From Swiss-Prot:
The keyword Phosphoprotein belongs to this UniProt entry's keyword annotation: no
Alphabetical list of Pfam families matching this protein: Zn_ribbon_Dof
Name of the molecule in the record: Dof zinc finger protein DOF3.2
Gene induction: By cytokinin in procambium.
Tissue spec: The PEAR proteins (e.g. DOF2.4, DOF5.1, DOF3.2, DOF1.1, DOF5.6 and DOF5.3) form a short-range concentration gradient that peaks at protophloem sieve elements (PSE).
Knockout or disruption consequences: The pear1 pear2 dof6 tmo6 quadruple mutant plants showed a uniform reduction in radial growth, associated with compromised symplastic trafficking.
Subcellular location as annotated: Nucleus
Species for this entry: Arabidopsis thaliana
Assembly with partners or alone: Interacts with TCP14.
Function recorded in the entry: Transcription factor that negatively affects seed germination and opposes TCP14 function in the regulation of a specific set of abscisic acid-related genes. The PEAR proteins (e.g. DOF2.4, DOF5.1, DOF3.2, DOF1.1, DOF5.6 and DOF5.3) activate gene expression that promotes radial growth of protophloem sieve elements.
């Protein structure tokens, strides 16, 4: 077989296939309904400025149109719904009453109740504790050799355990007695110093020292009372500063 004849046969078969394919497509395009060319009047505003959009629910008997004047849709042969002009477009605005209530609602003000730190923080039924009473309680604990923070005068309740503050300060009761709260000789010198000047003034308040007699551990000096008073004044100031912070 000649190559030219084979080429002609192949070309003839391809042309027939293309013609058959085009013939099959023509009926489909012919059956597709064309949109109406004439502009219909809007049933709502009676305007001719309308256009065809699509077939509703893919049904050829329900063409859907759009009016450019009132910006609303309608379906030919359907029921007209009561749609406002603009295609049911509504702006989301806050009501005037809600806005007014927001404006009239007072904002909570941040005020300080004016309570001192011991009352506001602990408040164990001691509503009248002041800094002066706290200093008095510290002085009372100092003179009676009580551990700090366990005296009932401070508003925390009394405690009979001498180890109540040992875990906090890392010391034992024997060490506290030896140090004597910066007065020396385990408190024995305190009694002798009280006999030398029983009416010493501590923090602006007159105090009556214990008059039970000395223990024989040494002679006390008034300078030790002054130094102890300075030490405890700085301690109280440090506590008050920490409470305010």
């Amino acid at each position: 077989m000649d190559y030219s004849s084979m080429h002609q046969n192949v070309m003839g078969v391809s042309s027939c296939s293309t013609q058959d394919y085009q013939n099959q497509k023509k009926p489909l395009s012919a059956t597709r309904p064309a949109p109406p060319e004439q502009s219909l009047r809007c049933p709502r505003c009676d305007s001719t400025n309308t256009k065809f959009c699509y077939y509703n629910n893919y049904s050829l008997s329900q063409p859907r149109y759009f009016c450019k004047s009132c910006r609303r849709y309608w379906t030919k042969g359907g029921i007209l719904r009561n749609i406002p002009i603009g295609g049911a477009y509504r702006k989301h605005k806050r009501s005037s009453s809600a806005t007014k209530s927001l404006r009239t609602t007072p904002e909570p003000t941040m005020t300080h109740d004016g309570k001192s730190f011991p009352t506001a923080s602990f408040g164990y039924n001691n509503n009248n504790i002041s800094n002066e009473q706290m200093e008095l309680g510290l002085a009372y604990a100092l003179l009676n050799k009580q551990p700090l923070g366990v005296s009932s005068h401070l508003g925390f309740g009394s405690s009979q355990s001498p180890m109540a503050m040992d875990g906090v300060y890392g010391t034992t009761s024997h060490q506290m007695e030896n140090t004597g709260y910066a007065f020396g000789n385990g408190g024995g010198g305190m009694e002798q110093m009280a006999t030398s000047d029983p009416n010493r003034v501590l923090w602006g308040f007159p105090w009556q020292m214990n008059m039970g007699g000395g223990s024989g551990h040494g002679h006390g000096h008034v300078d030790q009372i002054d130094s102890g008073r300075e030490i405890w004044s700085s301690t109280v100031n440090y506590i008050n500063t920490g409470a305010l912070l």
